[in-house]
Amino acid sequence: MGGEQEEERFDGMLLAMAQQHEGGVQELVNTFFSFLRRKTDFFIGGEEGMAEKLITQTFNHHNQLAQKARREKRARQETERREKAERAARLAKEAKAETPGPQIKELTDEEAERLQLEIDQKKDAEDQEAQLKNGSLDSPGKQDAEDEEDEEDEKDKGKLKPNLGNGADLPNYRWTQTLAELDLAVPFRVSFRLKGKDVVVDIQRRHLRVGLKGQPPVVDGELYNEVKVEESSWLIEDGKVVTVHLEKINKMEWWNRLVTSDPEINTKKINPENSKLSDLDSETRSMVEKMMYDQRQKSMGLPTSDEQKKQEILKKFMDQHPEMDFSKAKFN
């Protein structure tokens, strides 16, 4: 049987036919067999039973393909659900973990002296390493770069530094993100195990609400950008933490906040390596990798990938036309 392109050859025509059949697939199939009966010798042209045999074989072939596609789709969905659950569990565990309280231990004078000496030695070693790494003298180019960095820092003054998940740790909840998705963990200090009936989670295309029933919501505001509601989900972890998974519509941007009422994070300090490029489709992944490469090139004062292509084309053209004088030409 034909390949995928051959199969799709008549899709436009058949789709137009299907749209004119109000009775759906059953009416479309009836029309097709009516055509075979009236305009061809399909039913009577061959040996007895051949037409029925061909129909059965064709049906079985496409039924097997359909069942295989359904199994593969279910397997993909199950894998995605499992990965989301594992990711949500990790996020909930991090949100639930409490920093242990400081333990007070009385030191003797000798122990205190030794501890202070170790601290001083460690600090001196770090300072020396930093000096060796950076050099004792600042070059003019380095000074300009530092001035530019100071200027950028001034613009971003007051913004939060992203957490390890490229999101933010706020007083009442924690969120992390990749370019494609965002995960939120909201811990609740309750004396009982939470159930679905105890919480309110409302995920809309541009709005999110999370809280306990009968209580003011912990999260209630307009999202930074739109999400795919049908691909987003939530669950309760360990009976205490509500985790929400949001699928971004725009998979080429970092959110600087979860909802518009949140404090901003400094997206310039986001570490793209913490995001799983493997989670993205091939087209989006290649675009992200190109964006990251261009960003590194710009930071080093080197041409981007597009600029490199232009330079290669120009060089090739110049090599092909040695008779032309480009010495006075100006290129942008």
Swiss-Prot record:
Tissue-specific expression: Detected in fetal and adult brain, in particular in the ventricular zone of the embryonic forebrain and in the embryonic cortical plate. Highly expressed in brain cortex from new born and adult mice. Detected in the choroid plexus and in ependymal cells in embryonic brain.
Positions where Phosphoserine occurs in the chain: S136, S139, S261, S275, S278, S286, S299, S327
Motif Nuclear localization signal in this chain: 68-74
GO CC aspect terms: cytosol; microtubule; midbody; mitotic spindle; nucleus
Ranges in a coiled coil: 60-134
Single Gene Ontology BP annotation: mitotic spindle organization
Gene3D superfamilies reported in the protein's UniProt record: 2.60.40.790
Alphabetical keyword list: Acetylation, Cell cycle, Cell division, Coiled coil, Cytoplasm, Cytoskeleton, Microtubule, Mitosis, Nucleus, Phosphoprotein
Modified residues (Phosphothreonine): T108
Main location as per UniProt: cytoplasm
The keyword Coiled coil belongs to this UniProt entry's keyword annotation: yes
Factors inducing expression: Up-regulated in silica-treated macrophages.
Positions of post-translational N6-acetyllysine modification: K240
Pfam families per UniProt: CS, NuDC, Nudc_N
Biased composition, class Acidic residues, residue ranges: 145-154
Record's comment on post-translational modification: Reversibly phosphorylated on serine residues during the M phase of the cell cycle. Phosphorylation on Ser-275 and Ser-327 is necessary for correct formation of mitotic spindles and chromosome separation during mitosis. Phosphorylated by PLK and other kinases.
Keyword Nucleotidyltransferase tagged: no
Entry-linked PANTHER family: NUCLEAR MIGRATION PROTEIN NUDC, NUCLEAR MOVEMENT PROTEIN NUDC
Family indicated by similarity: Belongs to the nudC family.
Subunit comment: Interacts with PLK1. Interacts with PAFAH1B1. Part of a complex containing PLK1, NUDC, dynein and dynactin. Interacts with DCDC1. Interacts with EML4 (via WD repeats).
Protein name: Nuclear migration protein nudC
Name of the gene: Nudc
